[in-house]
Amino acid sequence: THFMMGGDSVGFWADVLINAMGNITIDNVGVSDLILTKYFRNSFLATKVAFFNQVYDLCQATGADYETVAKHIGNDTRIGHSHTTITDERGFGGHCLPKDTSALIKTAQKHNTQLSILEEAINYNNTLRKDTN
């Protein structure tokens, strides 16, 4: 198991985790690195959800079986099966994915950096979520 930690109390919390869990790896990184890592992980997963919703749309349009197509895409270990389930609500929701994708976009804008792929995933997701409400 691998953990990232940052801040002034890393030593204390690393000891607590090692005592509780045994053989683990802990990286002591800067707080900015921790925050961006969380935002990017959740943004990647949100983008993956949006992508697989488009896979679903094309399967519906062509008569292909989404479950079969998604299964075989996910069998590629570089892709995996997480975040490929199509829900009745469609797209990504919940608390973390919308919040973190929005925060990452705002951070990028503040630093004059484009995240156009993520922006498109959010726009597509907003369209999906509107259509099902």
Where are these regions (language model features)?
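Terminal amphipathic helices with adjacent charged low-complexity linkers/tails
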Residues: 86-87, 100
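Internal alpha-helical scaffold of NAD(P)-dependent oxidoreductase catalytic cores
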Residues: 1-81, 107-114, 120, 124
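NAD(P)-dependent dehydrogenase/reductase Rossmann-like domain
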Residues: 119, 124-133
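A short glycine/serine-rich beta->alpha loop
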Residues: 88-92
